[in-house]
């Protein structure tokens, strides 16, 4: 079953739009372990325990899982084995989106092969600044998808994303350009922002695309507008 079908069926089945991260962040996990009397365990053991607990608690309430590749790479070979365990723990019918924010053109084909053939991931996040060629190797795989990051919530990114002016900022140029790279079933957009107006501007430019939202929780009361 392809990514898009899995995603839409999980949304319908679980009546949710929640995408849950599976990020073994050392600072977060150490705090979590101390509060449960598990501080004497190895970090790898903690990560396994935490990931399994999160999946078991959320499997009926999410439409996708999204582990950040960098946290697993930082652990070395055991981290990549842990990512493979994540793939095995995620229930069938729930897509796995690997949050790689990949932007290196030379390694795209190799990463696409690893993620989609070896790991069995369903989608990957990409950084778009290298242009269409960054997405092409991933879109060669049928039934898989890419998620293009078009806006970051990081305050330091503002001067880049909103250049040269608010009437025609870079982030909207990215939204317009990348839609030509793949169909709505192949290419989604990720929007990180605490400003609902930015989300609204992206939606106006991309009315048919699925959007993955980040950093918008504090603005819940303003989303309907």
Descriptions of predicted regions:
Residues 1-67, 72-85, 89-93:
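Conserved N-terminal beta1-alpha1 strand-loop-helix module at the mouth
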Residues 14-18, 60-63, 92-94, 122, ...:
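Short, well-ordered coil/turn segments that N-cap beta-strands
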Residues 50, 54, 82-86, 111-115, ...:
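A general structural detector for well-ordered alpha-helical segments in enzyme core domains, enriched
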Residues 25, 34-38, 104-188:
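Conserved anion-binding
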Residues 189, 193-225:
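A C-terminal functional module that forms or caps the active site or interfaces directly
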Residues 66-67, 72-75, 94-97, 101, ...:
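Catalytic beta/alpha-barrel core
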Residues 8-12, 84-91, 139-141, 179-182, ...:
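Surface-exposed amphipathic alpha-helices with a cationic face
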